[in-house]
Amino acid sequence: MFLVGLTGGIASGKSSVIQVFQQLGCAVIDVDVIARHVVQPGYPAHRRIVEAFGTEVLLENGDIDRKVLGDLIFNQPDRRQLLNSITHPEIRKEMMKETFKYFLRGYRYVILDIPLLFETKKLLKYMKHTVVVYCDRDTQLARLMKRNNLNREDAEARINAQLPLKDKARMANHVLDNSGEWSLTRRQAILLHAKLERSMEYLPLRLGFLTGLAGIASLLYLLTRYLLPSP
C-alpha cells in the first residue's frame, strides 16, 4: 500500500474531488479531522496544550478554543513551534492507525486530504504521490466571491493568504484541473484512480508484511515443536 497526498486551495474544488474518490470506494483520511480529534479533552495533546498555554485557551465545556489559541500563536514563531511539537506527533500517530486499518482491509492506496501539504512539508516524505486540485485564479476568485458572498477585495485577500495554486501544481505529481466543466474534472479523478489502482507500488509493503507474518508463524511453530513439553 502507498500514500497519496491530496491538496488544493480555497474554492479550488478539493472537497468535491474528494467526494468523487469516496464514491469510487477509495480510502480517504482527512488530516484536519484528525487534528481536531487529537486535541479533544482526555487526549494527551489536550493536556499538554493546557499546560503550555494555560486554561485561557479552554471553552466552558473543556474544549480547546481554537480562536483564542490561534490568536496566542499569531506572529509568534516560538509559540507556534511549541504547539506543533505537541500536536504533530499525535496527528502522525492517528494517521498511522487509520492507514494501518485500511492496509489490513486490502486497500492498495490511501488518500490523505492535507490542506497545507506543500506549505508545511512535514508529511511530504511519506507520500508516494501528490495531487493538487487546481483552477486558474480568475475562476478561483469568481467561485469564492459567489460561494462566500465576498467582495473582490476580501476574496483576493483570502486567496493571497495561501500559497498560489500554480506553485502547488508545479510541485505535485498529478494535477486535476478544475477550471472548466465539472464533468471534465470528475473524469480526470476517475482516470487518476484507475492509474493508481493499476500501480504495483503497493506490493513491496504488502509482501514485506506477509513475509514478516510467515517468519512469526515459523518461529511459533518451532517453539511449539521443540521447546514445549510433549503431552
Swiss-Prot record:
Keywords: ATP-binding, Nucleotide-binding. It comes from the Eukaryota. One of its GO terms (molecular function) is dephospho-CoA kinase activity. Residues 3-207 form the DPCK domain. One of its GO terms (cellular component) is mitochondrion. GO terms for biological process: coenzyme A biosynthetic process. InterPro entries: Depp_CoAkinase, P-loop_NTPase. ATP binds at residues 8-15. NCBIfam families: dephospho-CoA kinase. Belongs to the CoaE family. This is Dephospho-CoA kinase domain-containing protein. It comes from Mus musculus (Mouse). The lineage of its organism: Eukaryota, Metazoa, Chordata, Craniata, Vertebrata.
